[in-house]
Amino acid sequence: MRKTKIVCTIGPASESEEMIEKLINAGMNVARLNFSHGSHEEHKGRIDTIRKVAKRLDKIVAILLDTKGPEIRTHNMKDGIIELERGNEVIVSMNEVEGTPEKFSVTYENLINDVQVGSYILLDDGLIELQVKDIDHAKKEVKCDILNSGELKNKKGVNLPGVRVSLPGITEKDAEDIRFGIKENVDFIAASFVRRPSDVLEIREILEEQKANISVFPKIENQEGIDNIAEILEVSDGLMVARGDMGVEIPPEKVPMVQKDLIRQCNKLGKPVITATQMLDSMQRNPRATRAEASDVANAIYDGTDAVMLSGETAAGLYPEEAVKTMRNIAVSAEAAQDYKKLLSDRTKLVETSLVNAIGISVAHTALNLNVKAIVAATESGSTARTISKYRPHSDIIAVTPSEETARQCSIVWGVQPVVKKGRKSTDALLNNAVATAVETGRVSNGDLIIITAGVPTGETGTTNMMKIHLVGDEIANGQGIGRGSVVGTTLVAETVKDLEGKDLSDKVIVTNSIDETFVPYVEKALGLITEENGITSPSAIVGLEKGIPTVVGVEKAVKNISNNMLVTIDAAQGKIFEGYANVL
């Protein structure tokens, strides 16, 4: 199972039912909607299509709303484009004007108060660089030297590297978009241009007003956000490393190390992190990724990212399906090359000790040492699954939850396959439900060793405190269990006591109709006892209880239906007999 999740931006190239189905089948886990473009009506159409196709395919696909954010842009230019030439001067005005090579204006009126002489102003993703030469507060104009030539079109982005700006956390448009997202029950909000914790709290305030359970992932795109990352993460559910604007706001050569540090801090807290922007950028035009792009994706996975994101590749590119397949193949290959033993050791040192983390560490170590097929996390809120994912186990993580909302929010978490399963909330019912669901996914089958982890008492968020080891097998018989032990052994069917004489019973489970005092010396040497006679006061029950031997009585036609030399598990607590090694310890 691929562990790294894939986020795809849905746009004109991918909004049809046919293409969304192809993206889901290729590996899309989360659909991103970029609210810098498009109307609410357009986005609603995309949301409806995504959910319709996901339901038809019986797949869980989450939806991420990416806000436009409090960005700075230029106003319109004369004839839609102007030419700025190196060595010339240009005035940046705070009052809206039609742009010319001598003067243009920006949407952010306080820019004049934030910059100083010597500050740099970058236009159009850094393609044009200006340096502030003079500031005229009376005219609300900033005179700049043009450091390199280029064409400037309408409404291009403006970046102020190294400058602390006083932009609001979210704009009115963002607030309207978030309320729309709440109405449409989106799963994640990616908040653009977050600089400080208060920016995230402004979004949380809107969510709390509407009682909406939506995860907030700030996008770190500037130096101020990088500087405040610890405080930002404290109030966030996850993070997006948005390398596009970040590579303009800070020197490009620093981006790789910043990426590693941001991912590491998320890993330490167990919060999901998405690495985004230009990951397979050439696939907007070409059917194959470059070698550098393949290395970029793989290295983000080695850094510890939970998810990798496609932007223009799927929104407007010529090869959206191929881009997702390429991303999937790179992820699978990178994951296969991981040293999971070293990864677990590194994560154990990285993450702070707590009760919940102790369970996560125990599960991950046990899964590694026993080479378990899957870890089944029974979870209400997704917390259990995230706790396990934090330690990057090699085993698949199957998150069994009664909540569709929780399942979708687990879609972004590394290594987690969410499954919606309703069920009773007693501990026994929860365990049985978890095992049955794991088998239904096709990830585990009879004879596979799995770990079940959950919180007890059930139904309470954030109480992960239980781990059980379980070997999957078919139930072949049941009756009344004596004691609470469990045992695995090979059956020896005895119609009379003579069938036991001279036999090594040290690894045997005796199967018989009933017993008397002549059986007792042999039963004492056996691992377990299965009989047809009924009742807790029957000789079989009394002997089993006195000798402390896992026993099941009242098993109909046990002698006839249970074969000799069959490996079975007796679960006395439940009065069940399983074929194979299916012990719950």
UniProtKB/Swiss-Prot annotation:
Keywords: ATP-binding, Glycolysis, Kinase, Magnesium, Metal-binding, Nucleotide-binding, Potassium, Pyruvate, Transferase. It holds the Pfam family PK. Its EC number is 2.7.1.40. It comes from the Bacteria. It catalyses: pyruvate + ATP = phosphoenolpyruvate + ADP + H(+). Pathway: Carbohydrate degradation; glycolysis; pyruvate from D-glyceraldehyde 3-phosphate: step 5/5. Substrate binds at R32, G244, D245, T277. The record marks K219 as: Transition state stabilizer. Mg(2+) binds at E221, D245. One of its GO terms (molecular function) is ATP binding. Its cofactor is Mg(2+); K(+). NCBIfam families: PRK05826.1, PRK06354.1, pyruv_kin. Belongs to the pyruvate kinase family. In the C-terminal section; belongs to the PEP-utilizing enzyme family. This is Pyruvate kinase. It comes from Staphylococcus aureus (strain NCTC 8325 / PS 47). The lineage of its organism: Bacteria, Bacillati, Bacillota, Bacilli, Bacillales.
